[in-house]
Amino acid sequence: MSAEESEEGATPAEVIEVVGKTGMHGEAMQVKCRIQEGGNQGRIITRNVLGPVRVGDVIQLKETAREADSIGGQ
């Protein structure tokens, strides 16, 4: 499988803030990212991301409509 095939249908989003760690063992990072293409272009959403991530990284989102719940909300 080539890189082009795996990114088919994905939307790029730039990480603008790392909110914190989430998950039972802190394995995921919650980030705020700005959608760069498509109908939601310019919208800022909160997502959970696995693996190392920092501000300025561009991640590929399969779905831009879903948002993650806030960390430690009551």
Swiss-Prot record:
Q: Which UniProt keywords apply?
A: Ribonucleoprotein, Ribosomal protein
Which Gene Ontology MF annotations are present? structural constituent of ribosome
> Do you know which CDD domains this protein is assigned to?
S1_S28E
UniProt xrefs under InterPro entries: NA-bd_OB-fold, Ribosomal_eS28
Please indicate if the UniProt record lists Glycoprotein as a keyword.
Answer: no
Q: HAMAP family, per this entry? A: Ribosomal_eS28
NCBIfam families tied to this protein: PRK04007.1 (NF003080)
Report the protein name in the record: Small ribosomal subunit protein eS28
Q: Which organism is it from?
A: Halobacterium salinarum (strain ATCC 700922 / JCM 11081 / NRC-1) (Halobacterium halobium)
Q: Which gene encodes it?
A: rps28e
